[in-house]
Amino acid sequence: MKYGFAGSLAAACLAFCLFFCPRLEAGKPNVIFIMVDDLGWMDLACQGNKVVDTPNIDRFAAEGMRFTSAYAAAPVCTPTRAAVLTGKSPARLHITTHAPGGFLPKASKFLPAKTLIDLPLEHLTIAERLGAAGYRNAFLGKWHLAGDSRRGANGKGNVEFYPEAQGFHINIGGCAYGGPPTYFDPYRIHTLPPRKKGEYLPDRLVDEAISFI
């Protein structure tokens, strides 16, 4: 039985979640959700950055809604992603640090909280909710919710917890990796086949996103 989805927003390698209604109906807008790891509150030009230009993101901010007092659910990637997908706090999900865990120094006097390294399938995700409402969903980029990337070749991990099992119809690049082995093709990511040697990973993901749209 799936647990209920509670609304949540958190901003946190790069991932796109694309939710599109094949026949756009009134009240059912298409959705593009972009998550960026380790993004500081003033890293975007629209937030006051005077060094880096981010014109496209600035346009999103100007034409959409800005949450000026929002906080990420956790300071690291895996629990934040799990929280965004499910609307639940990392503590309730038992995902409290980035997979595969075990990052405390060996000499530490503290015991780490028991943490899962997969997103259990019984938790209902926003992708599953939107799929039930008629949306077709794609995931592109970093997933990092499918076990230990050292299990299997090229970040395979636990395939039974991939985006396809969590409400996404298309998965491009999502696997157990917490970061790509390289940012240039060939990427050595088994869910992202080589296309053009030397190609830059962010460019590839954007091309794939545009193709899906």
Segments predicted by a language model, with ranges:
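Intrinsic disorder/low-complexity segments
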Residues: 1-7
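Bacterial N-terminal signal peptides
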Residues: 7-19
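Formylglycine-dependent sulfatase
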Residues: 4, 22-213
